[in-house]
């Protein structure tokens, strides 16, 4: 079975959003963000000097890779997609490209991705990795500075530390951090079923192609989602929580290739919806807008009937625990 056939029959996976934002749980100095928890640095404009100190107290003593993997497997999921690095710029694995990572910057000093890769191999699960290839708020040249509206904070780009967007050069970030880190995750953790990119903006077609070609060089069977940007993908990620009523009668290739939602041409007919169980991706302790188990099952069956995979997210807390209510729903 090739990777396209596997993906089509997989149907159901678990996404995990976990990072320094999990420590805050949606609250900063007594104020709560009304938006998604993993965007809290942007929402409150928390400067890197202060935000990065969170790493010194990130010690998730209850993290257990086998528990995460066996939980997903027991829920009938076929693959797991974990945030190796989200927009905050902090990596959950040991990165030689940037010491702002779980092993070098926290008292935990364990490579979370390595442990998850081992657990997935042991239990016969596929591992995919999310990687934010455009937004990186920890880097002065992180992308996103072409957009001014529609985000869950005060800016797509880090305008609270680096307010002059005209001085930013994404190519520096791409060459010095993005490319080296993508190469790391491709070469350090065995076979990956997919790389899940996000929010393309200033990334050029040439840069998207560089990432595409690097992935296919190291892991020819690794699938690439549409948010890599510029049409260089294997399958289409629909919008966040997008549950279409029906498939369009015709799908052409005129859609915005960098758009985050809606149907666009998929070269192998592969589609996916990533979705939350409440109203946030990263842990937010006061978000109780939970979907019912019945709604989750209805959405899964509806999407799968149309041939669309359902990638359901959990947001573990700062100690590494998947919230009990998430487990109850699934």
Features from the language model and the residues they span:
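Mature catalytic domains of secreted/periplasmic carbohydrate-active enzymes
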Residues: 1-330
């Amino acid at each position: 079975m090739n990777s396209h056939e596997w993906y089509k029959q997989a149907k159901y996976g678990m996404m995990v959003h976990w990072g320094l934002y999990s420590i805050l749980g949606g609250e900063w100095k007594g104020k709560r963000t009304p938006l998604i928890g993993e965007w809290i640095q942007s929402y409150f404009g928390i400067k890197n000097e202060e935000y990065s100190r969170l790493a010194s107290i990130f010690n998730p003593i209850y993290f257990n890779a086998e528990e995460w993997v066996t939980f997903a497997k027991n829920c009938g999921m076929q693959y797991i997609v974990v945030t190796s690095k989200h927009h905050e710029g902090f990596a959950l694995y040991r990165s030689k490209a940037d010491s702002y990572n779980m092993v070098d910057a926290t008292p935990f000093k364990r490579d979370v991705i390595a442990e998850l890769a081992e657990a997935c191999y042991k239990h016969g699960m596929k591992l995919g990795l999310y990687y934010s290839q455009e937004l990186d708020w920890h880097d002065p040249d992180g992308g996103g500075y072409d957009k001014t509206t529609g985000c869950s904070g005060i800016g797509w780009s880090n305008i609270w530390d680096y307010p002059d967007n005209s001085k930013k050069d994404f190519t520096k970030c791409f060459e010095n951090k993005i490319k080296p880190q993508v190469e790391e995750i491709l070469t350090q953790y065995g076979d990956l079923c997919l790389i899940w990119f996000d929010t393309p903006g200033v990334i050029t077609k040439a840069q998207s192609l560089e990432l595409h070609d690097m992935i296919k060089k190291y892991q020819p069977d690794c699938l690439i989602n549409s948010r890599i940007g510029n049409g260089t993908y294997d399958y289409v990620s629909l919008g966040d929580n997008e549950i279409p009523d029906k498939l369009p009668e015709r799908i052409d290739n005129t859609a915005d290739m960098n758009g985050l939602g809606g149907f666009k041409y998929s070269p192998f007919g592969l589609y996916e919806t990533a979705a939350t169980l409440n109203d946030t991706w990263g842990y937010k302790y006061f978000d109780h807008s939970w979907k019912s188990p019945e709604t989750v099952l209805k959405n899964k069956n509806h999407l799968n009937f149309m041939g669309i995979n359902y990638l359901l997210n959990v947001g573990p807390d700062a100690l590494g625990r998947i919230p009990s209510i998430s487990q109850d729903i699934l």
